[in-house]
Amino acid sequence: MMFRLTSVGCFLLAIVLLNVAVLTNASCRNEGAMCSFGFQCCKKKCCMSHCTDFCRNPGKRAHGHGLLRFWGQR
């Protein structure tokens, strides 16, 4: 009888844990959705109030001016 109660308890615990896992993943936001924090997004990246794979910094281009100035001083 004890074995039956233990296995039923484990089975119910497994169902509860699976439901928690499904609910946790269902609450995340897809790419392009509005966000305030990274944990709200499925990919854990909130950039400029939108869920995204990576952040782009408009207006900041990668220039080698600093490197060229460094080599020019030598």
UniProtKB/Swiss-Prot annotation:
**Annotated tissue distribution:** Expressed by the venom duct.
Proline amide modification sites are: P58
Is Disulfide bond included in the keywords of this UniProt record? yes
Q: Which InterPro entries match?
A: Conotoxin-I_CS (IPR013141), Conotoxin_I2 (IPR020242)
The Gene Ontology CC terms held by the record are: extracellular region
What are the record keywords, sorted? Amidation, Cleavage on pair of basic residues, Disulfide bond, Secreted, Signal, Toxin
The disulfides recorded in the entry are C28-C42, C35-C47, C41-C51, C46-C55
- Removed propeptide positions: 62-74
Please give the Pfam families that the UniProt record associates with this protein. Answer: Conotoxin_I2
Signal peptide as annotated in the record: 1-26
Q: Which GO molecular function terms does the record list?
A: toxin activity
On the tree of life, the source organism's domain of life is: Eukaryota
- The UniProt entry lists the main location of this chain as secreted
* Notes concerning its domains: The cysteine framework is XI (C-C-CC-CC-C-C).
The family annotation for this protein states: Belongs to the conotoxin I2 superfamily.
Protein name per Swiss-Prot or TrEMBL: Conotoxin Vt11.3
- Taxonomic placement: Eukaryota, Metazoa, Spiralia, Lophotrochozoa, Mollusca
